[in-house]
Structure formats: structure tokens, C-alpha cells
């Protein structure tokens, strides 16, 4: 097989070069998989710098696409494992990086494949497809697979992740993420920095794992999702299904929250409420 010189030397800053490569490989960017290419080199560099890769660290990249970020990451890490669901992109990645000793390509859906890989990794990186970003983050938390992560996501989702108590964006997802990670906003990215240009702005976030005191994650997650599904209701009207012992309601700590709505309760307070309810089970 004769490899295409153009495809092997993609100018990631050039829409013309990207278009030509896609045309050559008969690839049409798929919205379903968030196939928008970041064409601003300085932004790419800034995002990678935020990973702060140390010597000997092992990195996972979810959805490398044409390999713009992959190319930079491979210069900084001893081992990069890339998960790519699109077989046509996998072919390009293999051609460009397959002979490098520090590159490993996993073909298929990250959520279905990652458990089969060596879990001894240090950091995870991705420009996450907008439609699955919350699913990926939630799944990693639910599986207690907590690593330092840098993700670029839809700004609307980032606003929920970084939301403060008493704000409209404060949600169950806010509580889920902030209970497990310190969240740092790296930068906002305008639509014109991508090809094809998405209809929404993007934001890059850094998630750093932190310790918490959640006694029963399953019950905590269920509690938070339930009360936020009725966010205009006061807590006393939504936690009734979690109370198996009426003595729970006499807890002085719990009493002060019964007349509050979920957006008025902090992440740490949700943890304490969940632990209190769990103690009476």
C-alpha cells in the first residue's frame, strides 16, 4: 500500500490541508462523534501545557481524530494510548504514528474498551465529543476511575461543571463532578478556532482528583440526581423516599436543610446529608 504523502503530513492549522486529507480518505466529519478539528496551534499548545506532563507519565487520549494533539503529546510522554472509534481515522493514526514505540492505538468505543487496558496511567486527555462528554465523565466517576484529566467540552456543560451554589447552572452534574475533583478552567475557545466550526463555544477544563468523605457513592449519586430532578421543590419534599427511619428527621443537622432547595445546598453539605441518611439505613 502506498501511503499518501499529504495525509502523512497534515497541516493541522490549515483548513485546506484538512479538507484535502478528508477528501482523499473519503471522510466526512461526523457530528455524532464530535469531529471538529482545532486549527489554532497556540490554543493546542496551551491545552497540552495545562496537562503538565511529567517525566515517565503515561497518558490516555480519547478520540484523537486526525492526530493534531497526538503529535504534540507524543513528544512529551513515554506512552500515549489513543482510543479512536472511527476506523478511517484509526488508519491515518496508524500511518502517522504506528511505528513509534511510545504510541498505542485502541480501535473502538472508549467506554467499552478502557477497562481492558492497563489501568496504570497518570492522566487522561480529550477534546470530548459534545454529545457524550457528560456520559464519559459520569462513567469514570461511577467506576471510581479518578485520574487527572484535561477535557475540552461544550461551554454550556463547562458552565455546569464549574457552577457555584445558588446559581442557575448549579446542578446534579456540578455536585457529582465537584465532589470528586478540583475543577480549574483553562480557557474558552471560540467557534472559529475549529473546522468545521461548531455552533457552540467550547471550554477546556482541568479536573484534579480530590478526597471526599462519601460513605455510600451509589446512595449519594441517587440522592443528588433525585433532588435536582425536582429542583424547585424543597428538600423535605424530595428526600422522603430516602428516609427509612423517622428518627432521621430529628437530626439537628438535617433539619436546617429541609426547607432549602437543591441549588442552595453546597457540595460538602450534600455529602453530609447523604452520610446522615445512610447512617439510619
From Swiss-Prot:
According to its UniProt record, the EC number is 2.1.1.182
Q: Example GO molecular function term?
A: RNA binding
Q: Does the keyword rRNA-binding apply?
A: no
Q: From the Swiss-Prot or TrEMBL record, state where the protein is found.
A: Cytoplasm
Q: What class of enzyme is it?
A: transferase
- A cellular-component GO term for this protein: cytosol
List keywords of the entry alphabetically: Cytoplasm, Methyltransferase, RNA-binding, rRNA processing, S-adenosyl-L-methionine, Transferase
Q: Which coarse location class applies to the principal site listed for this UniProt protein?
A: cytoplasm
The record's catalysed reaction(s) read: adenosine(1518)/adenosine(1519) in 16S rRNA + 4 S-adenosyl-L-methionine = N(6)-dimethyladenosine(1518)/N(6)-dimethyladenosine(1519) in 16S rRNA + 4 S-adenosyl-L-homocysteine + 4 H(+)
Positions binding S-adenosyl-L-methionine in this chain are: 36, 38, 63, 84, 109, 127
Query: Which SMART domains would you find in this protein's record?
Result: rADc
Q: According to the UniProt entry, where is the signal peptide?
A: none
Give the family, as the similarity comment puts it: Belongs to the class I-like SAM-binding methyltransferase superfamily. rRNA adenine N(6)-methyltransferase family. RsmA subfamily.
Q: What does this protein do?
A: Specifically dimethylates two adjacent adenosines (A1518 and A1519) in the loop of a conserved hairpin near the 3'-end of 16S rRNA in the 30S particle. May play a critical role in biogenesis of 30S subunits.
Q: Under what name is this protein listed?
A: Ribosomal RNA small subunit methyltransferase A
Q: Which organism does this sequence originate in?
A: Borreliella burgdorferi (strain ATCC 35210 / DSM 4680 / CIP 102532 / B31) (Borrelia burgdorferi)
- Which lineage? Bacteria, Pseudomonadati, Spirochaetota, Spirochaetia, Spirochaetales
Amino acid at each position: 500500500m502506498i501511503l499518501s504523502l499529504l495525509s502523512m503530513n497534515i497541516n493541522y492549522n490549515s483548513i485546506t490541508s484538512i479538507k484535502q486529507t478528508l477528501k482523499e480518505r473519503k471522510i466526512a466529519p461526523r457530528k455524532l462523534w464530535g469531529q471538529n478539528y482545532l486549527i489554532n496551534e497556540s490554543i493546542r499548545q496551551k491545552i497540552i501545557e495545562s496537562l503538565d506532563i511529567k517525566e515517565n507519565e503515561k497518558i490516555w487520549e480519547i478520540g484523537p481524530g486526525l492526530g493534531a494533539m497526538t503529535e504534540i503529546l507524543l513528544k512529551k510522554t513515554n506512552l500515549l494510548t489513543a482510543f479512536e472509534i472511527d476506523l478511517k481515522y484509526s488508519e491515518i493514526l496508524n500511518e502517522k504514528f504506528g511505528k513509534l514505540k511510545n504510541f498505542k492505538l485502541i480501535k473502538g468505543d472508549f467506554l467499552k474498551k478502557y477497562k481492558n487496558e492497563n489501568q496504570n496511567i497518570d492522566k487522561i486527555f480529550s477534546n470530548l465529543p459534545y454529545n457524550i462528554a457528560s456520559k464519559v465523565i459520569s462513567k469514570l466517576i461511577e467506576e471510581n476511575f479518578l485520574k487527572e484529566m484535561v477535557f475540552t467540552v461544550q461551554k454550556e456543560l463547562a458552565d455546569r461543571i464549574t457552577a457555584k451554589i445558588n446559581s442557575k447552572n448549579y446542578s446534579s452534574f456540578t455536585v457529582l463532578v465537584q465532589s470528586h475533583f478540583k475543577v480549574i478552567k483553562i480557557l474558552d475557545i471560540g467557534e472559529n478556532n475549529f473546522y468545521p466550526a461548531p455552533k457552540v463555544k467550547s471550554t477546556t477544563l482541568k479536573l484534579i482528583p480530590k478526597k471526599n468523605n462519601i460513605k455510600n457513592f451509589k446512595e449519594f449519586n441517587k440522592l443528588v440526581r433525585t433532588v435536582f430532578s425536582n429542583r424547585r421543590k424543597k428538600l423535605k419534599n424530595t428526600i422522603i423516599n430516602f428516609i427509612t427511619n423517622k428518627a432521621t428527621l430529628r437530626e439537628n443537622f438535617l433539619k436546617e436543610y429541609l426547607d432549602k432547595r437543591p441549588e442552595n445546598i453546597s457540595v460538602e453539605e450534600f455529602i453530609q446529608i447523604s452520610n446522615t441518611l445512610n447512617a439510619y439505613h
